């Protein structure tokens, strides 16, 4: 199997992911659907050879990490083709891999459906901005577009902490330091603590995985830095609850107060199928207001969704507002809108 040909085919077919798994032909995910190549099923020796070639393309990365731990994440670039993010793993004793295709050039935000209110958060000087949603919903791309906007318009020091690095940012008006976990630094929390001594203006934290990382991220936002990060939640209230619930019960009151002071926005996004067989992102945008700050501080978090739902303006709107607009524009069906809605009964009355 020629791994370069496999990667070229994925880029040519606008695939987002490539699956190399023993017992199946090579498979691609494009527009949310998985398509299998009409070839013979891959045997374990073939998947092993493919995974070994991926490690060679990643600059001779040590495959022993995968062999000893059973999984490994890394990224690499093929000049003139694209960047790729690999999650290699063992399944049924055979080496396998899922390869994410990452374009060299960032798409224009408006071309991929990122609304102006989301992009406006690049202009914040401090605080915490969270981009949330399920895996594969485009969170990394949204964050990369925000970093790119800052890089090309402001004189800042931007530090990104990623696992692994996806989009590469060239220095422009800003200085961009990109650090990869397990390559340039040991862990998110160590890198985050170190970044506070590196004169940052903006910190992009790839993922808030535990309470220790969340705690340091909020401290960074509290001390005058702009912090972007992600969570696998949908909806502003769910996101706030998730952050507070990560902490021990005796700290949750203090964390709620701290979060109410530093949180600037929660952007939730999903990819939904369109009538032409493609996908389009749909967003919920919550911008912080005095009323929402009070709700977070006073343990009235469930009421936040009501504020967002009733606002339904471009600068703050619910997921259902975005779905309704896509339906009115003829881009998605009513069934799709209802299946992705946060309040299907309410949305059904508006369709």
Task: Kindly label every feature range from the protein language model.
Residues 1-351:
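Short, flexible helix-loop junctions that flank or precede catalytic/ligand sites
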